[in-house]
Amino acid sequence: MFGTLGAGLSNFPWLSASILFPIGSALVIPFFPDKGDGKEVRWFALSIALITFLITVGSYINGFDINNENVQLKENISWLPDLGLTWSVGADGMSMPLILLTSFITALAVLAAWPVKFKPKLFFFLILVMDGGQIAVFAVQDMLLFFLTWELELIPVYLLLAIWGGKNRQYAATKFIIYTAGSSIFILLAALAMGFYGTEIPNFEFSHLAAQDFSQKFQILCYVGLLIAFGVKLPIVPLHTWLPDAHGEATAPVHMLLAGILLKMGGYALLRFNAQLLPVAHAQFAPLLIVLGVVNIIYAALTSFAQRNLKRKIAYSSISHMGFVLIGIGSFSSLGTSGAMLQMVSHGLIGASLFFLVGATYDRTKTLKLDEMSGVGQKMRIMFALWTACSLASLALPGMSGFVSELMVFTGFVTDEVYTLPFRVVMASLAAIGVILTPIYLLSMLREIFFGKENPKLIEERKLIDAEPREVYIIACLLLPIIGIGLYPRLVTESYIASINNLVDRDLTAVKSAVKTNIFSGTKKNEILKAPTI
C-alpha cells in the first residue's frame, strides 16, 4: 500500500500544482463579500499560501534527487504546437531552492500584510497571483514560456506599488514598469532568435537550446541583450535606479517580495541563460561580471552609508549584497558559483527580514528619516533585539548564512586559476572595501534609531509600542533558516551542487573558445580546467 502511495506521490504534478493552485485560488477572492475589514480574505490567502508552500516542500521530498544534475519532476504538455510553445516545467538544483524560497517568503508576506485594510480583496489577489507567477519563473523549461511568466509578475507589482505605496507611489510604480517591461523586450528577442535558430520549426525548450551549436557572434548578441534584461532585475549598477524608488514607496509585504524573491529572478536567469545556454559568450563576458559585481558592492555600500532615509539605506544595501552574486556567476569554480546560489537564498531571507522590520518601525514612528529617530530603544526593546539580529545577519556575522555565502564567493574567486593573479587580487581587494563598509553603516543605523537622546515629540505623540507576537513570529521564521544555513550550509548546498558542477564544467570547456585577454591565466588557456569540489 505504501509503495503504491509513494509511486502516486512521485507522479503527482507537483510543480504545475504549485503554480496553478495559488493563481486559481486567487480567482475565488472576487466572490468574497465586501463587508467588514477583509478578515475572511486574509485567512483564505494565508491558507492558500501555506498550502502552496507545502506543495513545494512535497515536490522536494517526494520527487527530487539531490544527486541528479538533470531536470527532474518534468511535465511536458503541448500547448500551442504551431508556435513551438509547450507547457514544460521541471526543476534542477538551480531552481528548486528558489522555488522553496518563493513559497516560503510569500506565506510570510501574507502574514505581514495582516494590517492591510484598504482594498484587501485586490491586495491578496495580487499577492497570490505573484506567488504562482514567481514559482513559474523558476520552474518553466521553455524560454518563450519563461518570458510570459517573467512578464506575469510585472502587473501585480505595479499595482501593489501604485495603489498601496507612499506619496510618490505613482512615480515609483511607473519607473518600475518602464525599466522592467522595457528591458524585457530583449528576453523576447533572444527567445525568438534562439528558438528559430537553424530551423523553420521553433523549439524553445531549454534542453533543445542547450544542445544547439550557436555561433560565437550569435551568442554574444543574445548574451548582451539578456544581460541588460536580467541586469535590470538583479539589479546591476547603473540599471538599478528603479529599486530604491520602489522600495522607498512599497509596503512591508511588498518589500519582502521585492527583496526576497524578485531580485533573485535576475540572478537565476543569468545562471540559467547566460552561463548555461550561452557558454562561449559567458566565457568572454565573465570578467565583466566580476567588475560589475565589485562596482555593485562598493558603489551601493557607499551610497547606503550616505542615505538618511531608512528604506533607501536598506535598498542600497541589497544592491551591494547582490554584487556577490555577480562575482560568483563570473567565477569559473564550483565553489564560487555555489556561493552565488547560496547568496541568493541567504539574501532572500535576510532582505525580507530587514524590510519587514523597516515597515514595522515605520508603522510606529510614521517617519523614515534617521534624523527624527532617536532613543526609541527604551520603548521598543524587543524590536531592538530583532533589528540587531537581522542586521548582524546582513553584515555576514559568522554563524549566519551571509557569512558562509560571501566566504564561498570570495574563496571561489580568489582560488580560480582561470583568471590571472593580479586581476584576482585587485578585484578581491576592492570587494573587501564593501565588506568593511557594511558593518559600519548597519551598526551606525542601529545606533541612530535606538540609542541617543530621545525625541520627545516622537515618543509622546506616537505612543510607541513594542513588537507584537505576529511580528516576532515572522522574524523568528526567517532567522531560523538564516542561522541553520550559517551553521550547516550543506542543508542548502547539497540540493544544487550536482547542477552547479555540471554548469561549471560546461563553462570551463567554453574557456578554450574565449577571447584570449590578459585577464585569463596564460597557463590555462589551452586546457579544460577541472572544477574544484566543495
UniProtKB/Swiss-Prot annotation:
The record's catalysed reaction(s) read:
a plastoquinone + NADH + (n+1) H(+)(in) = a plastoquinol + NAD(+) + n H(+)(out); a plastoquinone + NADPH + (n+1) H(+)(in) = a plastoquinol + NADP(+) + n H(+)(out)
Q: Which GO terms describe its biological process?
A: ATP synthesis coupled electron transport; electron transport coupled proton transport
- Say yes or no: keyword Calcium present: no
Top-rank taxon: Bacteria
User: Is Transmembrane helix a UniProt keyword of this protein?
Assistant: yes
| Cellular component, GO, one term | plasma membrane-derived thylakoid membrane
What residue ranges are annotated as transmembrane? Answer: 12-32, 44-64, 96-116, 120-140, 144-164, 176-196, 220-240, 251-271, 285-305, 314-334, 340-360, 384-404, 425-445, 472-492
Top-level EC class: translocase
**InterPro entries per record:** NADH_Q_OxRdtase_chain4, NADH_Q_OxRdtase_chainM/4, NADH_UbQ_OxRdtase, ND/Mrp_TM
- Give the GO molecular function terms: NADH dehydrogenase (ubiquinone) activity; ubiquinone binding
Looking at the Swiss-Prot or TrEMBL record, what is one Pfam family this protein matches? Proton_antipo_M
Which Enzyme Commission number(s) are on file for it?
Answer: 7.1.1.-
Q: What does this protein do?
A: NDH-1 shuttles electrons from NAD(P)H, via FMN and iron-sulfur (Fe-S) centers, to quinones in the respiratory chain. The immediate electron acceptor for the enzyme in this species is believed to be plastoquinone. Couples the redox reaction to proton translocation (for every two electrons transferred, four hydrogen ions are translocated across the cytoplasmic membrane), and thus conserves the redox energy in a proton gradient.
Task: Spell out the PANTHER family in the cross-references.
Answer: NAD(P)H-QUINONE OXIDOREDUCTASE CHAIN 4, CHLOROPLASTIC, NADH-UBIQUINONE OXIDOREDUCTASE CHAIN 4
Instruction: Write out the similarity annotation.
Output: Belongs to the complex I subunit 4 family.
Recorded protein name is: NAD(P)H-quinone oxidoreductase chain 4
Show the taxonomic lineage. Answer: Bacteria, Bacillati, Cyanobacteriota, Cyanophyceae, Synechococcales
